Regions:
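Short Lys/Arg-rich amphipathic alpha-helical segments
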Residues: 1-112, 116-150
Length: 150
């Protein structure tokens, strides 16, 4: 089975169910194939969400894989340490601190700041010195939520 075909079908199903495919890995062959799927959504992902996606993917995969092949499907949330890929992922992280890399006037800048607003294609952050930083989503290279233990 072709990894690109599986990924495309996976993206379609995940999207139809109202989630985003934020990570995909297909490895192995024959009886040792593993499909790892990482999903996210506008709300936090829970075990029920993963089970729903898994059930729909398994229905489709059974028709795609040869009877001589077997596979293991793992569906999970991406985890807090993964960068956000879609602007729709940001609102649920309002008032959280981010590590951000972004493009500004053909240079790459990095900062840590608190997300204070999401408006269409722009994200507003509050910097350490209390200034508002507005970044267009298209200019963000990498944005990760910083884990806080306080």
């Amino acid at each position: 089975m072709n990894a690109e075909n599986i990924k495309k079908i996976t993206e379609d199903i995940v999207s139809q169910l109202g989630f985003y495919l934020v990570g995909f890995n297909f490895r192995g062959h024959g009886k040792n194939q593993v499909v790892e799927v990482f999903i996210d959504g506008k709300n936090y992902i829970n075990a029920d969400d993963c089970a729903i996606v898994s059930r729909h993917l398994n229905e489709k995969y059974r028709a795609m894989f040869s009877p001589d092949d077997s596979y293991r499907l793992d569906v999970s949330s991406p985890g807090i340490d993964r960068p956000l890929k879609f602007i729709e992922q940001f609102p649920k992280h309002l008032n959280k601190k981010f590590e951000i890399s972004y493009s500004y006037n053909n240079e790459i800048r990095k900062t840590n700041a608190e997300l204070i607003n999401v408006n269409n294609d722009e994200l507003s952050f509050l910097t350490r010195d209390g200034k508002e930083l507005i970044i267009k989503f298209k200019d963000i290279i990498k944005a990760k939520v910083l884990i806080s233990f306080s």
